[in-house]
Amino acid sequence: MTPDERSVLIRQYADGPAVLRAALSRVPDQAMKWRPAPGKWSVHEIVCHCADSELNGAMRLRYLAVEPLPRIVAYDQDAWAREFDYHGLDPNLALSVLDAARRWTVPVLERMGEEQWRREGTHTERGRYTVEDWLRTFAEHVATHARQIDRTVAAWKARPSGETAKGSLVALGHRRTGE
């Protein structure tokens, strides 16, 4: 990855909270906790996931950039959503966490030297995992969820009138693991 390519991805990473807020501005209040299908996240849960993922990601970057061959541990994202009862948490606080973690991490990325960019560790699901892999993943992560929010709102608007949330996280039959 060239320094110019990195700069583009760092800017995309920095812009993530604004992208998420733009998607959230299109969500009716009544749609925030609606799930498009059993086992799928609501917009509210997506926002909380982004905060938890960002906290994990910020630490992963630091381990990768500094520690010798760190082990990067995946986590069961659905279990976090269920066990931490994301619907019971404040999505505005989650947005603040996301924003603060990114504002704290962007200068780290901007100041990293070439040696740090070449560092790597081992991800428990993906195997070899480099700082550049991390940047590619997290530069796109929030934008991916912003598109998911748009799809969820479209499904909410297209639902038969009077339909309530479909399913719960308790009924999840699959394991969605960590970026």
Give the ranges of each region predicted by the language model.
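A short small-residue
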Residues: 1, 78-86, 125
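Amphipathic, non-membrane alpha-helical segments in soluble helical-bundle scaffolds
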Residues: 3-17, 40-47, 91-95, 132-135
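Alpha-helical bundle segments that constitute or directly flank the non-heme di-iron/ferroxidase center
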Residues: 2-29, 52-59, 63, 140-143
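Short, contiguous alpha-helical
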Residues: 31-79, 103-106, 114, 118-179
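Acidic/histidine-rich alpha-helical segments that form the ligand environment
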Residues: 12-23, 81-119, 138
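Short coil/turn linker and secondary-structure boundary residues
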Residues: 1-4, 27, 41, 89, ...
